[in-house]
């Protein structure tokens, strides 16, 4: 396949109301071992054009994920990578430093912002302080000159806030690679809400 995904874990430290994964998966889901992920990656041709790292929240498996990322960097020198994360873990300087040290050159980090305020963002993630952690993580990654895509999933809870989100990005997140506006997938929690 020209487009391959590594699903690291179903677990997530947010509980987004529109998440396509069921609540039980996010709370109790399993994770792939790093060794198994490396074994699978060995069977993908080195010239594959694109790889996505996703989850749940892939960084929920902890710092051992960096071993896998380094393996990918060494094997897939010309591959484009997309890392899908809620970005909260990058409020921690240690995670920013480790990612910077091992991330492949042709990488984009896709991070969702659900609102221009903590009230809206945290209301959608159902997680207190997720707004501040996400914004902090984005800004720290930008300071390291990493390529960031902001993802905005539109729902009735943030549709009226799109202009404010755009203003926030323009005013306080210079260096963003691009912004993607995404429709909700009507499965999992999104179907319920």
Regions found by a protein language model. Name each.
Residues 27, 117-124, 187-192:
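A short acidic, helix-capping loop that chelates divalent metal ions and anchors anionic groups
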Residues 12, 111-113:
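Conserved phosphate-donor/acceptor-positioning beta-strand/loop module used by diverse small-molecule
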């Amino acid at each position: 396949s020209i487009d391959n995904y590594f699903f690291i874990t179903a677990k997530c430290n947010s509980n987004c109301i529109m998440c396509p994964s069921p609540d039980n998966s996010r709370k109790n889901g399993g994770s792939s071992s790093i060794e198994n992920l490396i074994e699978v990656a060995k069977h993908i041709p080195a010239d594959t054009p694109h790889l996505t790292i996703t989850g749940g929240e892939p960084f929920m498996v902890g710092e051992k994920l960096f071993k896998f990322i380094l393996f990918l960097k060494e094997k897939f020198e010309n591959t484009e990578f997309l890392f899908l994360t809620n970005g909260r873990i990058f409020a921690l300087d240690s995670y920013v430093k480790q990612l910077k040290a091992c991330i492949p050159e042709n990488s984009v980090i896709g991070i969702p912002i659900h609102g221009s305020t903590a009230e809206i963002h945290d209301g959608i993630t159902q997680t207190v302080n997720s707004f501040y952690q996400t914004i902090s993580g984005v800004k720290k990654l930008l300071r390291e000159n990493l390529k960031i895509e902001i993802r905005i999933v539109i729902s009735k809870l943030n549709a009226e806030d799109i202009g404010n989100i755009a203003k926030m990005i323009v005013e306080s997140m210079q260096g963003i690679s691009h912004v993607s506006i995404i429709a909700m997938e009507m499965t999992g929690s999104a179907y319920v809400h």
